[in-house]
Amino acid sequence: MEIIEADEQHIPAMQKIYAYHVLHGTASFETQPPDEGEMSARLKKIQEAGLLWLVVLHEGEVKGYCYLGRYRERFAYRHTLEDSIYIDPGFQKRGAGKALLRRAIDWAESHGYRQLIGNVGDSEN
């Protein structure tokens, strides 16, 4: 496995992974999967905010992704981020999510963030 920063070339694979989780789980809190254009806009928003979006690659293919977004916009939450992790259903239970989370935690700590919040919305995790 290789973990790298996400870019536009990863959008189609990330959209496919996310669409699966929207349609077959409850963790995303969305009911309709966003299209590639919306996924691209989300990636751009995270990157323009100076935050982190990673993909995990296996044999050159995107098998999951993780990003850190602002938890709340209020000033008191300025050191708090929320993590989101989505793994290809055929690649789960291989440590990809754990590896992404470790990298996200390390990045957050090195950038002065003090809290990382993850909401788990699916009891089958």
Write out the residue ranges for each language-model feature.
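Conserved beta-strand-loop-alpha-helix junction that forms the acyl-donor binding cleft
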Residues: 92, 118-125
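Conserved GNAT-fold acetyl-CoA-binding loop/helix
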Residues: 15, 19-43
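Short aromatic/hydrophobic contact patches that present stacked aromatics
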Residues: 2, 28, 82-86, 117-119
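Short coil/turn segments at alpha/beta junctions that flank glycine-rich nucleotide-binding fingerprints
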Residues: 25, 94, 111-114
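Conserved GNAT acetyl-CoA-binding A-motif
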Residues: 108-121
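Acetyl-CoA-dependent GNAT
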Residues: 33-90, 101-102
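A short beta-loop-alpha structural element at the N-terminal edge
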Residues: 2-14
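Conserved acetyl-CoA-binding loop-helix of GNAT-fold acetyltransferases
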Residues: 93-106
